[in-house]
Regions:
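Cytochrome P450
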Residues: 1-417
Length: 417
């Protein structure tokens, strides 16, 4: 199958397709297809690269525009600057989650600066690199099982299982408690989307509350008996007498788990699928381990795990010849920017040795992903080991994407080995 083959015609629109179509808000760019959004993005980038939809939301598809907005501190990630203000309805289950510290990704300086500085002390590149032997051991165990069984679901068995175990070990979550975490993460991450059913909304809120309750108990245990794990390190971290409050610590740990699990799972699944559709690139990487870093960077660019992120101007801003009104939402379509021909040569082609593949999948600026180093490490080991261990890897069935518009990933990816 070629990179452009997507046998999903005549499929009933999924929530993700409805959200995407509604967000774009105009059929002049063609019918939005969540399984293959690139033609729509290409037309937007050519015909209306700075596009304001009927709801007043501005969508950006060019790399230069997206990068400029993400790097500009006048564009906030906090809904506090929205005009009109965004207020939850009295019966919205998400109101049960209010009252604590907002997630780090939705904070502005100086709160963001303070928390990021504290958290970074427990999340250094050196501490992540120390995980390499353990990640390799976990991947080898999963692939041993696949060899015995003659195949695996790359999403469920590798993408789903690996980051859960790694993050749980990093945080110090006991082995017996881990099975429930993956389900909580999947349910809670849906809260990033709109167009949720009442059941999805309730499950997401319950999962977030369960996360918070679990970690409150774990914090209490680590205060009494610290261990060599990240929770203990975060409890102990201090900067000029400043420490993390309980609600800040809880918010950070839950975010680390959800972001670290979901994005890595999507990187492994999307990346493997891209390689299966590009056998010459898979072979090139398989025979050259020196391409590990470059290949994963290219997979992040080609079909990244995070599709978009939003910002709100805190004042009227003129940027790249366009006026962004204060308080009106701006959406940077990271997936579209990562295939901008003004930035990348032949962007629809997967090239694991691409010499300049700096991409936006981990955002930019002050909100650059704190766990990027861990995701890259897991992606390099998981996907690199998979294609080297099983040179005859083949699709067992055509996969489908999950109904999640912000985080882009496959429901499953069944392969034979």
């Amino acid at each position: 199958m070629t990179q452009t083959d997507h046998p999903h015609d005549n499929v009933v629109p999924t929530p993700a397709q409805r959200i995407g179509g509604a967000l774009i808000g105009d059929d002049r760019f063609g019918e939005f297809d969540w399984h293959d959004p690139w033609p729509t993005y290409d037309r937007m980038r050519t015909e209306a690269p700075i596009w304001q939809n009927p709801e007043g939301i501005t969508l950006l598809t060019r790399f230069a525009d997206c990068e400029a907005v993400l790097r500009d501190p006048r564009f906030s990630s906090s809904n506090d600057h929205a005009d009109p203000p965004r207020v939850l309805a009295a019966d919205d289950p998400r109101s049960l989650m209010e009252g604590g510290s907002a997630p780090l990704i939705f904070l502005d300086p100086p709160d963001h600066t303070r928390l990021r500085k504290l958290v970074s002390k427990a999340f250094t590149p050196r501490s992540i690199e120390r995980l390499r032997p353990r990640v390799q051991q976990l991947v080898d165990g999963i692939l041993d099982r696949a060899a015995h069984e003659g195949g695996l679901d790359v999403v469920a068995d590798l993408g789903y299982e690996l980051p859960v175990v790694v993050i749980c070990e990093l945080l110090g979550v006991p082995l017996a408690d881990r099975p429930q975490f993956a389900g909580w993460s999947s349910d809670a991450s849906r809260l990033l989307d709109d167009d949720l059913t009442p059941d999805e909304l309730n499950r997401g809120v319950v999962a977030a509350i369960n996360f918070a309750g679990y970690f409150e108990a774990l914090f209490a245990d680590r205060r009494l008996a610290p261990r060599d794990d990240m929770v203990s390190a975060l409890l102990a971290v201090e900067e000029q007498g400043d420490r993390l409050r309980e609600d800040e610590l809880r918010s950070i740990v839950v975010l680390l788990f959800i972001a670290g699990h979901e994005t890595t799972m999507n990187l492994i699944g999307n990346g493997t699928y891209a390689l299966l559709r590009s056998p010459e690139q898979r072979e090139r990487w398989r025979h050259d381990p020196s391409l590990d870093a470059s290949a994963v960077e290219e997979l992040l660019r080609f079909d990244g795990p995070v599709h978009l992120t939003g910002r709100i101007p805190v004042e009227d801003i003129e940027l790249n010849g366009h006026l962004f009104p204060r308080g009106k939402s701006v959406v940077t379509l990271l997936a579209a920017a990562n295939r901008d021909p003004a930035r990348f040569e032949d962007p629809a082609h997967l090239d694991v040795a691409r010499p300049d593949n700096h991409q936006l999948s981990f955002s930019q600026g002050i909100h650059y992903c704190l766990g990027a180093a861990l995701a890259r490490l897991e992606g390099q080991i998981a996907v690199g080991s998979l294609i080297r261990r099983f040179p005859d890897l083949e699709l067992a069935e055509e996969p489908q994407y999950r109904d999640h518009f912000v985080l882009r990933g496959l429901k499953s990816l069944r392969v034979t080995v």
